[in-house]
Regions:
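N-terminal anchoring/stem segment of glycosyltransferases
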Residues: 1-63, 69-74, 230, 234, ...
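Short aromatic/hydrophobic "clamp" motif used to bind/position activated sugar donors
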Residues: 79
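Catalytic core and acceptor-binding pocket of nucleotide-sugar-dependent glycosyltransferases
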Residues: 116-233
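Conserved donor-nucleotide/metal-binding helix-loop-beta segment in metal-dependent transferases, i.e.
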Residues: 87-116
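Active-site acidic Asp-centered loop
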Residues: 82-83
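Short, conserved loop/helix-junction motifs that constitute active-site signature segments
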Residues: 29-30, 73-74, 95-99, 124
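Short glycine-/acidic-enriched loop or helix-start segments at secondary-structure transitions
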Residues: 20, 47-48, 89-93, 133
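Non-catalytic N-terminal targeting/anchoring module and adjacent flexible stem/linker
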Residues: 1-6, 183, 188-290
Length: 290
């Protein structure tokens, strides 16, 4: 799949190794105009160009860079934003209509007409990048909500920014809402079991820092994999967590009694598999790394 109008981008000062894997997995499935990793770490890789940035000491720093700094580094018509927990999974799901819009991301749960969408795996036009830079927003975090909800009416009226309709966004990516069909990409560590298998999953887990590995999203990944009929993947995740993270009570308890619902699970939204029961969906996963 040739996407010669799109630059593949990740910005990560915490998990650059995992972000590089997201770039690698995406490049295995599509040819991009360019691939760039923005980080403060000394990274040597042939997977992407590495551009040094000041360290992101908070999520707000990341958001400000995405809103104000990214435009200066992009020469293509579009950028595809990936993160350590979101990347391309099915190039055959690409739809040229995605590029009819300035922003495409997985739909959120909101029912007010402003539910597109998640920024962790998102397609953005160069026009949008210039608009977010020039707007000089005083509130920047989280950047996807600032673009797609808080300031969406302003971006539409002042800059003519076009957001993809929900039906098309569902074909592009998913996060908390399963589409029931293959999508171009996904976001969310809890969904990684749908995208990776075997050595690729092991490489991804190894690339995570201990603090991220022991966090709620990775534990929810194990829970959802178990509920989705892949206890082997759940056990792979949990064993990695227990081997590296001290006093991770949630992982230890789930290893002992995996069929129980535990208090460590995220309370923000229902898990994908819990929401849809047995109607879970999984594309052909990546099972190896180059």
């Amino acid at each position: 799949m040739s996407l010669d109008r799109v630059t593949l981008v990740a910005a990560d000062c915490l998990n650059p190794a995992a972000a590089l894997l997201a770039i690698e997995f995406s490049r295995e499935r599509c040819d991009f105009a360019d691939a760039v990793l923005f980080t403060d770490r000394p990274v040597r890789t042939a997977v992407a160009r590495v551009v040094a940035v000041s360290r992101f000491s908070s999520r707000a720093d990341y958001s400000r860079f995405m809103l104000e700094g990214l435009a200066d580094h992009v020469r293509s018509d579009f950028v595809l934003i990936v993160q350590w927990d979101g990347f391309v999974i099915d190039p055959h799901a690409w739809d040229e209509r995605f590029m009819d819009y300035d922003y495409v991301g997985a739909p959120w749960w909101y029912q007010d007409g402003m539910n597109v969408g998640n920024g962790g795996f998102s397609l953005r036009s160069a026009r949008l990048l210039r608009a977010t830079r020039d707007a000089r927003l005083t509130e920047v975090d989280p950047e996807d909500e600032m673009i797609c909800r808080r300031h969406r009416p302003m971006f539409e009226a002042r800059y003519g920014i076009r957001f993809a309709p929900e039906a098309l966004a569902r074909r592009f990516s998913f996060e908390r809402i399963l589409p029931g069909r293959s999508t171009f990409g996904f976001h969310g560590a809890f969904n990684v079991w749908r995208a990776l298998d075997g050595r690729a999953l092991g490489a991804w887990l190894s690339a995570l820092t201990d603090s991220v590995l022991g966090g709620p999203d990775v534990l929810e990944l194990a829970y959802d994999a178990w509920r989705g009929g892949r206890p082997d993947l759940a056990l792979t995740v949990l064993r990695e967590v227990v081997s590296r993270v001290e006093d991770c009570e949630g992982a230890s308890r789930l290893l002992k009694k995996p069929n129980r619902t535990h208090s460590w699970r995220s309370k923000r939204q229902p898990s994908c598999t819990e929401e849809l029961g047995d109607a879970w969906w999984r594309p052909d996963p990546i099972d190896d790394v180059q």
